[in-house]
Swiss-Prot record:
Alphabetical UniProt keywords: Methyltransferase, S-adenosyl-L-methionine, Transferase
SUPFAM superfamilies, per database record: S-adenosyl-L-methionine-dependent methyltransferases, Winged helix' DNA-binding domain
Pathway where this protein functions: Mycotoxin biosynthesis
Pfam families, alphabetized: Dimerisation (PF08100), Methyltransf_2 (PF00891)
Binding residue positions for S-adenosyl-L-methionine: 262
Gene name of the record: bsc6
GO MF: O-methyltransferase activity; protein dimerization activity
UniProt-recorded name of the protein: 16-O-methyltransferase bsc6
GO biological process, one term: methylation
Length: 397
């Protein structure tokens, strides 16, 4: 029997249409503001019991999504050309219909799939997102590695008398895994987790730094130099080369070599990119490419505590010429009111690698303490992703 539509249902539908229309007329920053407003409004309506249940649910959502990945729910529904019956999904993944039905009903209740009829389901936009290899890699990485680390963090902070974590071998990760190695050393001995990490890192951010950073205006006389060996761009620790590919696409007319650097095992699996050279390079060792115009480090510094960041900077400095620029692509936090996505990442980096997301003052202290100077900062996303333009301090004297 159909449920009769109430006046409240009609008003909520109109409100939903208004919100969707408002979101369609704004940019990503405005969209995030709308989402934050709706979340805050929802939380303001909660009873104490509903607040408790929300926190219970937050933890279990992650568990259920991981189960959905294991059961191939998201890829199965995404590739289907029509809604699927429970039995048909079970035929794909071999799950018992009773268990599968319980999982699917929960996934539908948290809007990761659509329940369109009795024991009938189809994909929505979140389903399609979760079916992407990089997104699934991030889910699996978080489930396999970050969740145990997060669980160990409260007890570790109690043991430390609530002092900041500053050693990469004394983190919540080390406590959870009973390891004395830094995370990025340990993870290379864990093939599955390392593959999840590689997939997650390959996910392109929604915003493109090249739209905000005026690269051509920072070239100086580089474009007019006739040297065929001159190097335009070195992507240090660049994983599979997404940024090199983006640079080539946006500035096909620029001359100069483009070089992708990472550890040998990453370079070995990177697909060949036309016009992009590859080079095995550990960013903690002296930079092999000398005199490039741009040395680009994306999310490298936020992976490392300050002492290791100083080693990274020291390894680069001998390669810099007077016209060279270091581009640090990382977050520059607000002193007040930073978004929860970024403050979450800050705690996650502390728990995993004893690092942190940095404010402008913290970036300045780190760089000036290592003999460098910030020339400019270009923010390119509403989550404070920024290009920090840096030169050795001696070049600014």
């Amino acid at each position: 029997m159909a449920v009769q539509e109430t006046d409240l249902d009609k008003q909520l539908l109109q409100l939903s249409i208004q919100v969707a229309d408002l979101a369609a007329r704004t940019d990503s920053r405005g969209s995030q503001k709308i989402q934050d407003f709706l979340i805050k409004t929802q939380q303001s309506l909660e009873s104490p019991w509903e607040t408790l249940m929300r926190y219970y649910d937050l933890d279990f959502q992650h568990v259920a999504i991981r189960i959905g990945c294991d059961m191939q729910v998201f890829t199965t529904l995404t590739t289907a050309d029509k809604p699927m019956k429970l039995q048909d999904i079970a035929n794909v993944n071999g799950a018992s219909e009773r268990l599968l039905g319980r999982v699917l009903r929960y996934l539908a209740s948290i809007n990761t799939i659509e329940e369109v009829g009795k024991d009938t389901f189809e994909a929505n936009h979140i389903t399609r997102t979760l079916s992407k290899p990089g997104i699934e890699g991030g889910i699996r990485l978080s489930s396999a590695c970050q969740r145990p680390t997060n669980s160990a963090l409260p007890d570790l902070l109690v043991e430390r008398g609530f002092q900041d974590i500053t050693s990469a071998t004394e983190t919540a990760f080390n406590k959870a895994w009973a390891s004395r190695e830094p995370f990025f050393t340990w993870v290379r001995s864990q093939p599955k987790i390392f593959e999840y990490l590689r997939l997650a890192l390959d996910v392109q951010f929604r915003e493109d730094w090249l739209n905000a950073f005026p690269l051509e205006s920072h070239l100086g006389d580089f474009a007019s130099r006739a040297d065929p060996e001159k190097v335009l761009f070195v992507d240090v620790g660049g994983n599979l080369g997404i940024q090199c590919r983006g640079l080539k696409a946006k500035f096909p007319h620029l001359s100069g070599r483009i070089i992708l650097e990472d550890l040998q095992e990453t370079i070995d699996v990177a697909l060949a990119l036309e016009g992009v050279e590859t080079l095995a390079q550990d960013y903690l060792t002296e930079q092999k490419v000398k005199g490039a115009k741009f040395y680009y480090y994306r999310n490298i510094f936020h992976d490392n505590p300050d002492d290791r960041c100083r080693l990274i900077l020291d390894a680069l400095k001998p390669a810099m010429e007077e016209s060279s620029l270091l581009l640090i692509d990382d977050k520059v936090l607000l002193n007040q009111g930073s978004h929860r996505h970024v403050t979450m990442l800050d705690l996650a980096m502390m728990a995993q690698v004893a690092s942190h997301e940095r404010t402008r003052a913290q970036w300045q202290a780190l760089l000036e303490g290592a003999g460098w100077k910030i020339e400019d900062i270009f923010q390119y996303s509403h989550e404070y992703d920024s290009i920090i333009v840096v030169k050795p301090a001696a070049q600014n004297a």
